[in-house]
């Protein structure tokens, strides 16, 4: 069963990375990720997008002892890290509510819905540090692992009967913690390329601007007294 879970999680992570790659190619998504205005419309759109990613992860999960082994944490945690509190909480509400409605009365329906919301809060809490470049891949791995450990704790606190919850956590904890933490690093790396490309374009524009300044300075020092100097500066 453990090997099946590892394989399923790996497959789901691959699908999420594919989705992330396609999303980063859409001009609308790129502009929303890069914009500084933080318009509510953009925040809502990003929350829906990452909420749908979370829902997708629920559907592609594999059932195990009344629970669903999944990669849902990747969507909601990434929403918080990339988009901030509004996006993270919005995506978590969408993903968590769907998880509850997906299996109403199920053994882990409430606990998994609650943990999804908590994971969105965790991502939101680290958003400023992540955007400032203060959280590297190892930090992302650790945050995701801690979020998943939190999910296991919530399952133990809420799901009943307790012996069944304990058996479930013993079965799914290691695969979900390790694979989702690794998957989050790869998933965010896909989106980080958007910021890297933007920085590269900015650096190229600055290089061109400095080149123009270097070419113009000799003529500016002499003064624009001749037609030749004015044409050279232009």
Where does each model-flagged region fall?
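Short regulatory/linker helices and ligand/cofactor-binding micro-motifs at input modules
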Residues: 211-228
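Loop-to-helix transition at the N-terminal end of transmembrane alpha-helices
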Residues: 36-51
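Membrane-embedded alpha-helical hairpins and interfacial helices in multi-pass inner-membrane proteins
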Residues: 1-25, 47, 58-73, 103-216
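Interfacial segments of multi-pass membrane proteins
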Residues: 83-84, 97-102
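Alpha-helical transmembrane segments and their helix-entry boundary regions
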Residues: 65, 76, 80, 88-92, ...
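Membrane-interface helix-loop junction between the first two transmembrane segments
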Residues: 22-37
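Hydrophobic, membrane-inserted alpha-helices
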Residues: 50-54, 72-77, 91-99
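Short, intrinsically disordered, charge-balanced linker/junction segments flanking boundaries
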Residues: 228-234
